[in-house]
Design a protein with these regions (language model features):
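12-transmembrane solute porter fold
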Residues: 7-175
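C-terminal membrane-cytosol helix-exit motif in multi-pass small-molecule transporters
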Residues: 1-3
Length: 177
């Protein structure tokens, strides 16, 4: 804390704006873990094999790429909040569409809902990265490492927490049925 140019600026990392940003992308990463853990564990619990879910994962990949392309074409400084809102709406709609899943649900039944979640993911992460990196660049090159530290930490911890939460939920729910 008492260096002229620290490798990682603790004051900036603990500022309200940075903590708000980190909290938001951490929560979004936890929510997005549903797609990687929830859907795959759900189908695994139903006895559906990997080759039966291959088209679903192809659709998810295409939707993520579409979200990234949309960001590349439309994202400009100051528009990030629009992307956040749209991403959240896509994820919420996809989750709502999946809320009626039963033991009769098959991978083709959730193509649209999982595509919406994937598209939302493709919209959110590039916009968050651009906003955070822009904020770090404005402050100077030393803040870039601090931003990368925050971003990678939140994505790693969020993915682990999300996997643990959704995996535990699925295990508990399947033990009751």
């Amino acid at each position: 804390l008492h260096r002229d140019s620290p490798l990682i600026d603790i004051r900036w990392l603990t500022s309200p704006a940075t903590l708000h940003f980190a909290g938001a992308i951490l929560l979004m990463r936890i929510v997005l873990a549903e797609q990687t853990v929830g859907a795959s564990n759900f189908f695994q619990a139903l006895g559906i094999q990997n080759e039966q879910t291959l088209p679903l994962y192809g659709i998810i990949l295409c939707a993520i790429l579409a979200g990234g392309v949309t960001c590349a074409l439309l994202l400009r400084p100051g528009r990030e909040n629009w992307f956040y809102g749209t991403a959240l709406a896509c994820v919420a709609l996809g989750a709502w569409l999946d809320s009626g899943a039963t033991s009769q649900t098959r991978p083709h039944d959730i193509w649209l809902s999982q595509a919406l979640v994937a598209y939302g993911s493709g919209l959110f992460l590039p916009a968050a990265m651009a906003q955070g990196m822009g904020s770090a660049i404005v402050r100077g090159p030393l803040y870039i490492l601090s931003f990368i530290t925050v971003f990678l930490f939140t994505q790693s911890i969020g993915g682990l927490l999300g996997s643990a939460i959704f995996g535990t939920f699925i295990t508990l729910r399947t033990s009751f049925h």
